[in-house]
Regions:
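Flexible, glycine/threonine-enriched loop-and-boundary segments that flank and lead into catalytic domains
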Residues: 416-421
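N-terminal localization/anchoring segments of enzymes in phospholipid and broader phosphate metabolism
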Residues: 1-348, 352, 356, 396, ...
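Catalytic-core elements of nucleic-acid end-processing and repair enzymes
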Residues: 430
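Short glycine/threonine-rich loop-to-helix capping motif typified by GTGT followed
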Residues: 376, 402-406
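Helical hairpin unit composed of two closely spaced alpha helices linked by a short loop
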Residues: 367-389, 393, 398
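Glycine- and other small-residue-rich loops at beta-strand/loop junctions that grip anionic moieties
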Residues: 179, 367, 401
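Thr-Gly-centered strand-to-loop micro-motif
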Residues: 364-365, 422, 441-442
Length: 509
């Protein structure tokens, strides 16, 4: 009679996530012990390690890299002169592992022609919009498109029924790429349709981040999906080893259906994103549905990632859109950013919007952990008279990161930026909207990991009707928020010191 509870108990404590965490913790403890044992009493080794730390600091000073990241490491090395240099050699390289980098670059280079510039698609844009579009097209490279209908969703539960309808209509293929997939109501509804469509002969594929989904899926998930003819790739699989490679996660949220419809935004495939489960109060998110020519960018983004790990297609033409909406509602430019190169595409898009804004910039972000360049851009826009408003969570999912986000409030408020905290719960949306003609909806947080370490995606909207829909959503959300005042930001001396340390080390958190 006690057998079932015992089995459940051991299945919980012996699952893959728990085993991985325990093994990594043991490795960290062993490495610390080994370091202590080898350095104790060995003056020559201590001197060598200190010299290594000095060399690393000099290297960082000269390196062309994000200044906040460099300062974070220099501070850490200064605090831990014996260990700091060795830690940087082990964990300081931002680039993904060589194998991952080589695979993905090879595929992307082979399909550069699929994303060739299309000047006729941007002839209706003004000069400022064309400059931004040209940048993304050149350094992405992801072209902008007319003939694309868009629909903005102000929350996950508004998006979910429409997504199910589109999945039901699939005839040729369904591609999904997500950071988090978790068993529950949302995934069960999607999985049932995917299995049925796969049985009908529809090409169904799923890329999910192995770290993001580690706690949410059974260990035999891939086997079960493949048996149902749903092909799966766990991105950058988690192994129980201390490794920087685990930093580089696939944080994208993409659905592509028959090449004609695509979704992106902040919504993952888990119950909290549609408020079927309450974790941190009400979960406020955002997503966008695209139909038409611009879907092609997301199709290529997905296929490039897929073929890097399971080579299959050499010709992407069969996956091109077959239906274009009549007329054109502005211009849409989907894009992705990755740590494969040194081009900070996602950050530059945000910086450009702030630099070019004339009247307002409204921003949704769950986290605020930025470098001096982004901080200065926010302050400078406000000082120019632009109405800059930041909306952040009122109930955090990570308390330390929440404190870090709040540590930026004082300089921003003094510059004239208005800051709001969403009191009903956790705000997870990642959006920019400016001057009624420019917006971004995507997966890109305003933190170091999203801007420099993760694989991310977004959709730029130029003079599209859904720019106004996003603006109206922000304005409807503000009355549910608490506006932060300078008087709210008083803190004790220990608190101020903690905030300063968090700011310095924010790129490493």
């Amino acid at each position: 009679m006690f057998r079932l509870p015992i089995v459940k108990f051991f299945s919980r404590i012996l699952n893959r996530a728990t085993i991985t965490i325990v093994l990594v913790a043991l490795q960290v403890l062993w490495l610390l012990w080994a370091f202590w044992a080898f350095t104790t009493g060995r003056v020559w080794l201590n001197g060598l390690l200190k010299a290594l730390s000095i060399v690393i600091v000099l290297y960082l000073v000269r390196k062309d890299e994000n200044s906040a990241y460099k300062i974070g490491w220099i501070v850490l090395i200064g605090l831990l002169p014996l260990l700091g240099g060795a830690l940087y050699l082990a964990f300081g390289n931002k680039a993904p592992a060589k194998g991952l980098r080589t695979r993905m670059r090879k595929v992307e280079q082979a399909h550069t022609a699929d994303l060739a510039p299309r000047p006729d698609q941007t002839d209706t844009l003004d000069r400022v919009e064309k400059n931004l579009s040209h940048y993304v097209e050149t350094y992405g490279p992801y072209p902008a498109w007319k003939h694309t209908a868009a629909h903005y969703f102000p929350c996950g539960e508004a998006m979910y029924p429409r997504l199910l309808e589109d999945l039901e209509r699939a005839e040729k293929f369904i591609f999904l790429e997500f950071f988090i997939v978790k068993s529950g109501t949302m995934w069960d509804g999607i999985e049932a349709i995917l299995k049925r469509k796969a049985a009908e002969g529809v090409d169904v594929r799923l890329i999910y981040d192995d770290f993001g989904s580690l706690l949410g899926l059974p260990s035999d998930f891939v086997i079960r999906m493949e048996r149902s003819h749903i092909r799966c790739i766990p991105f950058n699989p988690v192994v129980p080893l201390v490794s920087l490679v685990m930093n580089h996660r696939d944080h994208r949220k993409i659905v592509v259906i028959d090449g004609n419809v695509a979704y992106t935004g902040g919504v993952n495939l888990a119950d909290e994103y549609i408020n079927a489960e309450q974790r941190f109060g009400y979960w406020k998110d955002a997503a966008i549905r695209l139909e038409g020519a611009a879907v092609w960018n997301f199709t290529v983004i997905f296929l490039n990632c897929w073929n890097a790990f399971r080579p299959q297609e050499t010709d992407y033409a069969p996956y091109a859109p077959t239906h274009l909406p009549e007329g054109s509602d502005g211009v849409v430019q989907p894009y992705t950013d990755s740590p494969l190169d040194e081009e900070p595409l996602a950050e530059t898009v945000y910086l450009n919007i702030l630099a070019q804004a004339q009247r307002y910039v409204y921003i949704y972000t769950p986290y605020l952990a930025v470098g001096e360049e982004m901080l200065d851009a926010l302050k400078t826009a406000a000082k120019r008279g632009v109405d800059v408003r930041l909306v952040l969570p009122g109930i955090p999912d990570k308390k330390l990161v929440f404190r870090l986000s709040r540590s930026y409030y004082v300089p921003l408020l003094r510059a004239g930026v208005r800051i709001y905290e969403y009191t009903p719960g956790f705000l997870h949306a990642k959006c920019y909207v400016s001057d009624d003609h420019l917006a971004v909806v995507g997966s890109i947080n305003m933190d170091y990991r999203s801007l420099f370490l993760h694989f991310e995606c977004g959709a730029l909207l130029y003079s599209n009707s859904q720019v106004i829909a996003l603006r109206e959503d922000v304005l409807a959300t503000l009355p549910q928020c608490r506006e932060v005042q300078l008087s709210d930001c008083r803190t004790s001396l220990p608190g101020t010191l903690l905030d300063s340390v968090l700011r310095l080390l924010s790129p490493l958190l």
